[in-house]
Every structure is written in structure tokens, then in C-alpha cells.
Amino acid sequence: MSERNDRKVYVGKVVSDKMDKTITVLVETYKTHKLYGKRVKYSKKYKTHDENNSAKLGDIVKIQETRPLSASKRFRLVEIVEESVII
């Protein structure tokens, strides 16, 4: 029961919403270089389940780790933190 609370939660930007019920989320974070100690920015893309197709390109979203939903989907959409502004 405690492992359900240990699931990873990330905040990232939607970079693709072309698939049905699936979005691609880019999560940026920092790592410290082992030798020099400088913080280096790196990013990773996660395929995420979006049941209602509610997230759009450019939105900032919160995603949570879940059971495998397909060959590549391991996360689900929790909430849309900030909607993108289309000019």
C-alpha cells in the first residue's frame, strides 16, 4: 500500500498531442557534473496517457507514474497546471 504513494510525479511541457489519448511530455531537470560540480540541464520525454484528450500542445502538465498501459506508456496525466496561450 505504501508503494502507491511512492510513485514519481513530474511537471513538464506537452510537446506532442497528435496521438489519440496519448501526449508526449518533455521534463527538464538538472544533474551535477561528477568532476566539475557544475549543474547541467538535461531533459527526457515521457509518453503519457490522456484519457479525455484534454491536454494541448504547449500546456504545462503534472504526470504520475502508473502501471504499464502500453509498450511505451508508463505515466498518466494528473492535471493541467497551466494552459498554453495561442496568439
From Swiss-Prot:
Positions of disulphide bridges: none
BP term (GO), one: translation
Keyword Cytoplasm: no
Residues of the signal peptide: none
Alphabetical UniProt keywords: Ribonucleoprotein, Ribosomal protein, RNA-binding, rRNA-binding
Gene Ontology molecular functions: rRNA binding; structural constituent of ribosome
One family name in Pfam for this protein: Ribosomal_S17
Cellular component terms per the entry's GO annotation: cytosolic small ribosomal subunit
Family annotation (NCBIfam families): PRK05610.1, uS17_bact
Subunit composition and interactions: Part of the 30S ribosomal subunit.
Family designation: Belongs to the universal ribosomal protein uS17 family.
Name by which UniProt lists this protein: Small ribosomal subunit protein uS17
Organism: Staphylococcus haemolyticus (strain JCSC1435)
Name of the gene this protein is made from: rpsQ
